Amino acid sequence: MKKISLSLLFAFIGLSINAQTAEELKKEQAPKKVEIEKLQGEVNSLQDKIDALNGWKKGAFGTIGASLSGFNNWYSRTAPNASAGNIGVSINGYANLIEDTYFWRNSGTINLGWVKLDDESFDGDEGFEAATDVFTISSLYGRRLNKKWALSGLVEYRTTIIDNFNDLGYLDIGAGLTWTPTSNLVVVMHPGNYNFVFSDASTAFDSSLGAKIVADYTNKYGGLSLKSNLSIFQSYSDGDLSNWTFTNSFAYTIWNGLGLGFELGLRNNKQEALNNAVNLNNALAAPLTPPTFSTVDNKLQSYWLFGLSYAL
């Protein structure tokens, strides 16, 4: 009994010493945490001052996603011998020149995706097929009226690069005003904009004069980088010729510029919906009544990508 009591006593003493040691270490740790937070605040403040300096500012980040699989004599499947793959890559880059009297902002976005489902019992399905194909570049030049407003001109080009480069293609050229309430937000308002549409075969597309509105937000919160861009064209001649595109990119850095990324794109374009409906109708053995702008189902277009992110 005495041995048990002594053992319990020593165990209690040991726990008390460990508890005291932990409390002492926590007390010693607390002021150091305060110092780190203070230093981090100073670092962030200095970075804000650096970002506010004139001159060129460049950067890029993106997402890479991939999934590959293979089956050999896997008899529970309809196709026991098959391979599948899904690969996606996105790149968001910018190069901005900021001066006291003018600015020149350039940006580019690429999002490409390929998919494959190869049933080895059939020929002709061995390769990857394009799934996502987005290419956008823009250049905005502005002469400042004051700190937040500027007279500006914009050139924006959108197309695909895997399939049918410049078919379809969109080129916006316009002029108006640009509002920059902060260094991270740019809002373009151009009442004079011409939307050129390039298409080799389809008659569903027309170029037109209209208004262009672009809102672009780019920022970084600790390890999180984000970019949102809304681009709207409102045709003066016909609402069916209007379109908008909204893209959002997020990248969270975990280690040495690498982390997790997510990108989501939404788009509405009635001309593209009509062109797709016409092509599907023409492919029928017995084509139906040709679709028109008034009958076509203009569904919301979307794409997304999740995977490994990188920042340069």
Labelled PLM ranges:
Residues 64-66, 89-97, 139-143, 157, ...:
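Residues on the lipid-exposed face of transmembrane beta-strands in outer-membrane beta-barrel proteins
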Residues 101-104, 147-151, 183-187, 218-227, ...:
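Repeated loop/turn-to-beta-strand initiation elements of outer-membrane beta-barrel proteins
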Residues 298-312:
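Outer-membrane beta-barrel "beta-signal"
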Residues 116-214, 288-289:
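Outer-membrane pore/translocation modules
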Residues 1-54:
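Cleavable N-terminal export/targeting peptides
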Residues 67-92, 118-128:
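Surface-exposed strand-loop-strand hairpins of Gram-negative outer-membrane beta-barrel proteins
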Residues 64-72, 99-101, 110-116, 157-161, ...:
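Transmembrane beta-strands of outer-membrane beta-barrel pores
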